[in-house]
Design a protein with these regions (language model features):
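Periplasmic-binding protein-like
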Residues: 76-80, 150-166, 236-278, 299-304, ...
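A ligand-binding cleft/hinge motif common to bilobed small-molecule-binding domains
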Residues: 118, 133-145, 194-195, 221-256, ...
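Catalytic and substrate-binding regions of cell-wall glycan-acting enzymes that process beta-1,4-linked
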Residues: 407-486
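Export/targeting segments at the very N-terminus of extracytoplasmic proteins
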Residues: 297-346, 381-384, 398-402, 491
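Extracytoplasmic small-molecule ligand-binding "clamshell" domains
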Residues: 54-144, 206-214, 275
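Bilobed "Venus flytrap"/periplasmic-binding protein-like clamshell domains
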Residues: 73-82, 86-103, 137, 158-214, ...
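Extended ligand-binding regions for polar small-molecule ligands
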Residues: 92-104, 163-190, 256-300, 313-316, ...
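Substrate-binding/active-site groove segments that recognize
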Residues: 185, 349-375, 382-393, 479
Length: 491
């Protein structure tokens, strides 16, 4: 997770089939809004080898006359569902499906992250890309320039409300009369509520919040915290956010479903046919189900329990490993112990939704960068020792940006938890928007939260796109608070 000073201008980041172990190494340069990702280049796979039965003769003739490109040019957008960077590694539901399809077909992928949906469609229309790996609404407007293909998704708006006894839940639109509902200004949610309110004859109290003040994710969090009673979002966004909160109900739809799919150019129906044939196979269908569970169902917050007892001067059963690794790398072992508690509750066998493993929740690719086989991440000593080296390297890299060693600890923790690329972005945003780029509390932490807003993560100073910073900010605060407690009670 270490990195060099982020360079200016636009660049392309290429990643091989092994996903180069750049992460957490000196000199790693984080990604950018226009990002190219090169995947494995294996044998060229023809359409004939992938074709199934049942297509019309004309479609089969057309498919047989084309070969799947050896390099598939693909565009997508930063979003919590399609593509994002987490701990400096590319992730996302659509991204994962794309990489699996490319590996199965034995082709390379040149992936570009476009700045907007309109620009992405323009890239397809001008022939700059072959495929849009993003859920494009299947409407008459888009069908003029986009031929649908790939995974089918049905999106509809839902009411987000606190989970209550069944008799207290709102289960019918008529029950919205008299209720207060908060939504983003000038959003489709506002327009849907206004139409629904008109259909019901009025009575819904619609509170419109400007995006500069709060985002959809903020409103969902406020419902969970009971700061506001209700909000409205798309079901896929609701499902992802529900994995961060245990006390939400998202079961009530407020609109008709809208189909969305990937897309190719209208004159590339043969490519769409090949992609659809791949998705129709049993193995891809099973993988798709696994990815749906990973991104939309698995809890992001459930770490189990661990009973703390500091009365005897001990924090965990692994204190001797924390002490030794801390001493070898110049880190207070109590800081690392505080991390271990917040990362996994000291559970050596924990595996997160993102694949991070062990007490210190290290990503397998990061482990390999430090010459540790992923199979050994469940070993407490190896896991803690590697985490200490990561923290050491992060501190060295961030010393270029944050001079005060004590203040830098918070930046290092944020980089460990969310990725140094996003921390670099937050530092740049803080400097640009009048905050102190060398102070975490109230400054860079606020800039990190801004990276959930398209207006800011699309800013030229940001190189790593969308980031849900809420959990990382809470992580830094939680670790630092526990660390201060340990300094008073444990030597």
């Amino acid at each position: 997770m270490t990195g060099a000073d982020p360079p200016s201008g636009t660049f392309h980041l290429f990643i091989t089939s092994g996903m180069s172990d750049n992460h957490n190494r000196e000199g790693y340069t984080p990604g950018k809004p226009w990002l190219a990702v090169a995947l494995c280049v294996l044998a060229l796979v023809s359409i004939a080898a992938c074709r199934g039965k049942g297509a019309g003769a004309e479609q089969e003739d057309e498919a047989a006359s084309h070969r799947f490109p050896d390099t598939l040019r693909v565009a997508t957008l930063y979003s919590p569902t399609s593509y994002f960077l987490y701990r400096d590694e590319p992730m996302g539901y659509d991204y994962a499906l794309l990489t699996q399809m490319a590996a199965d077909k034995g082709v390379a992928v040149d992936l570009v992250v476009a700045p907007s949906l309109q620009k992405m469609v323009e890239m397809l229309d001008s022939g700059k890309v072959d495929l849009l790996a993003y859920e494009i609404p299947v409407t008459a407007e888009y069908r003029k320039k986009v031929h649908p293909c790939g995974p089918e998704n049905l999106t509809y708006q839902v009411l987000v409300q606190p989970k209550k006894d069944k008799e207290k839940l709102i289960t019918d639109v008529t029950e919205l009369v008299g209720e207060d509902i908060y939504v983003e200004a000038r959003s489709k949610y506002q327009y849907r509520l206004e139409n629904l309110n008109e259909e019901l004859g009025g009575g819904i109290n619609i509170h419109v919040i400007d995006r500069d003040t709060l985002l959809t994710e903020d409103l969902i969090s406020m419902v969970s915290d009971e700061q506001i009673p209700l909000t409205v979002v798309d079901n896929d966004i609701a499902r992802i956010n529900k994995t961060y909160y245990k006390d939400l109900d998202i079961s009530m739809p407020l609109s008709f479903p809208q189909q969305s799919r990937w897309g190719v150019a209208p004159d590339h129906a043969w490519l769409a046919d090949s992609i659809d044939r791949w998705f129709a196979q049993e193995t891809p269908r099973r993988r798709q189900a696994e990815l749906l569970k990973r991104y939309f169902e698995l809890s992001k917050i459930d770490m189990g329990t661990f009973t703390l007892d500091l009365s005897k001067g001990h924090v965990s059963p692994f204190d001797h490993f924390f002490r030794e690794s801390g001493r070898e790398n110049g880190i207070d072992w109590r800081l690392m112990a505080a991390q271990g508690y917040h990362e996994s509750r000291f559970n050596p066998d924990r595996v997160s939704w993102a694949g991070a493993r062990g007490i210190m929740q290290i990503m397998p690719r990061t482990a390999r960068a430090y010459n540790l086989d992923a199979s050994r991440l469940a070993e407490p000593e190896s896991n803690i020792s590697t985490a200490a080296k990561i923290m050491r390297d992060l501190d060295r890299s961030l010393a270029k940006k944050v001079a005060d060693p004590k203040e830098r600890i918070k930046f290092v923790l944020a980089a460990y938890n969310g990725g140094i690329g996003h921390v670099y972005d937050a530092i740049a945003l803080a400097a640009k928007y009048g905050k102190n780029p060398q102070v975490w509390n109230g400054n860079v932490e606020q800039a990190l939260l801004m990276k959930a807003n398209p207006e800011y993560y699309s800013d030229p100073v940001c190189r790593n796109g969308y980031f849900r910073g809420r959990e990382t900010v809470a992580y830094v605060r939680g670790v630092m608070n526990f660390y201060e407690t340990l300094k008073k009670k444990v030597t």
